[in-house]
Amino acid sequence: MDFSPPHGLRGGRSPSLQDTTISSSHTQKNGGDSTPLPPINERLAFLRPSRELLEYYRKKIAEFDEEHEDLVKRLEQYKATYEEQHKLQWEMRQREEEIAELQKALSDMQVYLFQEREHVLRLYSENDRLKIRELEDRKKIQKLLALVGTSEGDITYFHKEPPSKVTIPQRTVQSGDPFDRKVQRSGRAGVKQVPLKAPGKQDRTKAAEKEDPQILLLQVEALQAQLEEQTRLSKEQIETLLEDRKVRMEEAQVQHQRDQDKMKAMTDKLNKTQKLLYESTRDFLQLKFECRANEKSWMAEKDRLLRELDRCREQLAFSIDPEQEREHEREHEREILRLSLAEKATRSSHSEEVKSLTEQLAQAHRLSEMYREQCVTLEDELGRIREEGDVGREIFKERSDKVAKRLQLMTQRYEALEKRRNMEVEGYKTDIKLLRQRLKDVEKQLFKVTLNIGPDQDLAILDAVRQGNKKTQKIQGELRNLKAKIYGLENELRIG
């Protein structure tokens, strides 16, 4: 900042080198005897500034005011821009956190959805099992009815409860030869045997041949449907996990690239700040060196001028009368005041420049410390992000291993179910064969019993029929309970 006016704008006459030397020497020699210096306003009153000088300083002050206002406006604009950038960065960070939370919630919802679908599949399998069991129970009832057989006096109820007591019609006692009654009973037994044996046997064999394969086919279809549903569910789970893995890898890659760009930008800023700090420090040291050199040159010039002033005073001591000497001293005092004011102005300007440079250096140090702290925080954040990425990779690897193990376990379970189904089919076939053999044996025994039936065996047959009715009643009660359970499960499935 140059406050010195150009040549020709200074007020009053310019002092010569000889006058300056004489006035400085006189001031130093008579410093102890003369009165103290007048105040600054009184000393400024001796100056005679011109209009050009005042106009020059007004222009300088106006330029400095405009420059100051421009710098303040720029500083405010920079502050507003930095605050807006910080606000946008903060909002972007919040949005990223919200996106991460939403993605986590979406993953949890997918897991819950798959769990609910597995639960629904289990309910479907339970429903199929109960329906197949209902068919088996019906088949058993029909077999039992076929084994027991029906007579003209017996009534079988399927929808209502059977009577608690079995009523048997009484036969009238016939007179005559007992041999004739025996033949008649055997004849009636033969009449009963012919319609009961052949059609009952054929119906039972046909029902066994028709119903058993039907139940097995239903079981096979239910197992196939369950296997298809489980396979489709497993495929969807694997596809969802792969898609989630792909999304997470893309997000990690984008975040890594963003961190790399941010690190690069911060490194460039740090290098620029270090360069600016170096240049500011170098300029400050250069200005300090120049200021000290100027001070040394001023001191040397002042010593030289003082010596010359002493020599000139000694020469003029005898040639000037006292009045002229006093007038000359007053004139030199005025010149000394002018020189001291100019010297103070230059010193104040230099001190202001040194002060501004010192403030700039301190500001540069603060900026360098701030950028260094930012770099340290960014490095810590980068390390944390890398650690989080490594942890995420490990978690994803563990999840992938768990999914692979689960898939292998499900495959083993499916194979075990297939083996079990095959073994159950073989067991059903063997059971069917055994039941057919037992039916044949029972039919043979019934045939023998009907042939050898006597008068005392009617009550035994009635007891067997009564027991069969009781068993039928018990089985019907169990069937009603099973139907109630099945209807309850179907209602729960509809409501769910």
UniProtKB/Swiss-Prot annotation:
Signal peptide: none annotated. InterPro entries: CCDC77. Keywords: Coiled coil. It comes from the Eukaryota. Residues 15-33 have a biased composition (Polar residues). Residues 1-42, 170-208 are annotated as: Disordered. Residues 51-113, 214-495 form a coiled coil. GO terms for cellular component: centrosome. This is Coiled-coil domain-containing protein 77. The lineage of its organism: Eukaryota, Metazoa, Chordata, Craniata, Vertebrata. The gene is ccdc77.
